[in-house]
C-alpha cells in the first residue's frame, strides 16, 4: 500500500514541497533564509492580527489605541514590539536572501527571481503603510514626504497624490486606507510566496558550487528540516533578545510624539531598512530623477540575468567579481548610514558618490569583470 503522504491529494503537494523534495547535498546556511522569511511572515501575520483587534484607524484615536495596546491589553506590549522588531528581522533576512541570490547566481532562475523582486516591492509597500499606522510624528511626516514624491509624475502627479491621500493632505481617509492596505498586503505576499516556491520547485534549487547537482540530491526531510529548525531557533533568539531588551533600538524617538501637521521634525527619515534607497533618492537634486532612481535601486535587480556574460554560475570561483560584490555590500551599508544623516556637507557628497557607485558596479563593473574572467579561463584552459 502507498504511504498516505504520497497518495492523498493535499498531502502529496506538501510531500513534494517539504519532505521528499530532491535537494542539492551541499547547500550551505545561506539557503536557510527562505524558511526564515516564511517564519517571519507567519509571525507578522499572527501578531498583526492581534494588533488589528485593538487598533483604531482614526486620526483622533490611532496614537492612543497603540498606547492602550501597550498598557492595557494582556501582553499587548509584547505583541506590538514583536510586530515592530519582527519587521526588522524580516528585512534583515530578506536582504541576506537577495544577497545570496546575487552571490551564487540564483538570478538565472528567471521566474523565481522576478517573483522575488515583486515580493520585495510588495513587502516594502506593506512596511511603509504599516509605519504610518501608529500616527506618531515620523509616521505622519514620512507618509507626507514619500507619498508627495508621486507628484513628480508629469501631468497626473498632483491628482494621483490627492487620490491616494483621499483629500488635500494626509488625514483620516489616508490612515483608514493605509490600514486596509496593511491588512490585505501580507495575504497577497503569502500568495506570491506560494508562486515563488512553485517556480523554484520547477527548476530545483541552486547550490554553492554553481554546478549541476542532479547527480547528487538528498531528500529535504530530515536533513534540511533539522537544519532549518536550528536557523529558526537562532532567529527567534535574536528576535526575542531585541524585543525584550532593546525594543525601541531600531525605532525613531519622534514617533513617541503624536502626529502634528503644524510641527515638522528636524530630520524626516523612514525606517532603517529603507535608508539606502532614501539616500539614493536624496542624492539627486531633481525630484522626478530622484523618484526614478529610488524605483530603479530595487528594479535594477531584474537586470542581473541580462547583465551576466559570465561562463560560470555564481561567484564561488570568480575573485574579481567577488571583490566587486563585497564593495557593493559595503556601499549599501554606507548608503544606509547616509540616509539617516542630515542633508548637509559632507553627507550629501558621500551619498552622491555612493549612489553613482551603486549603479555603476551593477551596470558597468560587474559585466566587465565577468568578461575579463572569461578571457582568463580561455588563456589557461
UniProtKB/Swiss-Prot annotation:
- Provide the assembly information: The cytochrome bc1 complex contains 11 subunits: 3 respiratory subunits (MT-CYB, CYC1 and UQCRFS1), 2 core proteins (UQCRC1 and UQCRC2) and 6 low-molecular weight proteins (UQCRH/QCR6, UQCRB/QCR7, UQCRQ/QCR8, UQCR10/QCR9, UQCR11/QCR10 and a cleavage product of UQCRFS1). This cytochrome bc1 complex then forms a dimer.
Q: Where in the cell is it found?
A: Mitochondrion inner membrane
- Other information: Heme 1 (or BL or b562) is low-potential and absorbs at about 562 nm, and heme 2 (or BH or b566) is high-potential and absorbs at about 566 nm.
* Name listed for the protein in its UniProt record: Cytochrome b
Give the gene symbol: MT-CYB
The chain's disulfide connectivity reads none
Q: What is the species listed in this Swiss-Prot or TrEMBL entry?
A: Kunsia tomentosus
- Tell me its family: Belongs to the cytochrome b family.
Q: Where are the transmembrane segments?
A: 33-53, 77-98, 113-133, 178-198, 226-246, 288-308, 320-340, 347-367
Q: Which GO terms describe its biological process?
A: mitochondrial electron transport, ubiquinol to cytochrome c
